[in-house]
Design a protein with these regions (language model features):
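Conserved N-terminal/central alpha/beta ligand/cofactor-binding core
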Residues: 2-5, 13, 19-21, 45-46, ...
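Core beta-strand elements of the Rossmann-like FAD/NAD(P) dinucleotide-binding domain
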Residues: 20-22, 188-197
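Rossmann-like dinucleotide-binding core of oxidoreductases
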Residues: 205, 209-303
Length: 303
């Protein structure tokens, strides 16, 4: 029961059922949360993985951020790049590739040359941090989001992780100075999940902030990405490289219509004829504000 006032509602104490107790509780089933849950389970821990949506993958799948990049330390003095994300990430990529759902350059193509740039830039496999052209090719992976969901689910199930979908994190359970569990909102009401170790993999620090951790608030460009089908990418790339000045004019015109975008605002995907559009850029929105996010959705859909 709740007590209603003019400007607020006073919620009275409630009895919340404990629906799971495990060694480890991971909140958020994006790439980080799935990897944390699988790793803990393989080390012999009982694990509960909590996700608010009906699928796994977070921004990688539902958010359609369709390139795994920033996975290397660039080599110096003619030494090759060091791939720093291996282990479970490598398992993901290998399984995606087995489903024809991941594409990345072989080591011999990871060099700085115009030939390789033309071959791999539209896959997003370039060092975006370098401004000089051609940018070096590096180990990055273009993937299909639905395949990512399938691979995530397979790995979680095989690892024996207890998965709780459709469970929206609500608040941390804190005893003394320790987080000992979480409360989630579900269609059946609020439920408690307890654990000896609780991992925040929400992406927005929801769990840690709820537990009282200090944080800083920043601002970044909001983007509503999308995909286009029926694109002849071979012809598009050929036109770009054979008619560079005309292509630049068209590209500038497109970006003005879109409302701001990265230089490589469209990229190829493992699905033939389908491109990923990482745009438009929409600065000034608060990612914590429901009203701000609604406004961003309207702008992203309608310009």
């Amino acid at each position: 029961m709740s007590e209603q006032h003019k400007d607020f509602v006073l919620s009275k104490s409630e009895q919340i059922p404990v629906v799971a107790r495990t060694d480890v509780v991971v909140v958020g089933a994006g790439p980080a949360g799935v990897s944390a849950a699988i790793s803990a389970a393989r080390l012999g821990c009982s694990v509960t993985l909590i996700e608010r949506y009906h699928h796994l993958g977070g921004q990688a799948s539902g958010g359609m951020v369709l390139v795994l990049d920033d996975m290397v330390n660039p080599g110096k003095d003619n030494r090759p790049d060091e791939i720093v994300t291996t282990g479970i990430v490598t398992e993901f990529v290998e399984r995606l590739q087995a489903q024809d759902s991941a594409i990345y350059p072989p080591p011999e193509d990871c060099v700085k040359s115009w030939e390789m740039w033309q071959k791999w830039s539209r896959w997003g496999c370039i060092n975006f941090h370098e401004t000089g052209m051609p940018q070096p090719i590096l180990h990055a992976v273009a993937f299909d989001p639905d395949a990512w969901k399938r691979v995530s689910l397979d790995l979680v199930r095989e690892s024996g992780v207890q998965l709780r979908l459709h469970s929206w994190f609500s608040e941390a359970i804190v005893e003394g100075s320790r987080v000992t569990g979480v409360i989630c909102q579900t269609k059946l009401g609020r439920q408690a999940i307890m654990g000896d170790m609780v991992v925040d993999a929400t992406g927005d620090l929801d769990l840690a902030a709820s537990a009282g951790a200090e944080y800083t608030k920043g601002e970044y460009i909001v983007t509503t990405v999308f995909r286009l089908a029926g694109v002849d990418t071979d012809r598009a790339e050929a036109y770009e490289y054979e008619n560079p000045e005309e292509y630049k004019k068209l590209d500038r015109q497109a970006r003005r219509i879109i409302g701001g975008a990265w230089g490589m605002w469209w990229l190829k995907t493992p699905l033939p004829g389908i491109v990923w559009c990482n745009c438009p850029h929409m600065p000034g929105y608060d990612g914590l504000s429901p009203e701000g996010m609604v406004a961003a959705e309207y702008q992203g859909a309608n310009g």
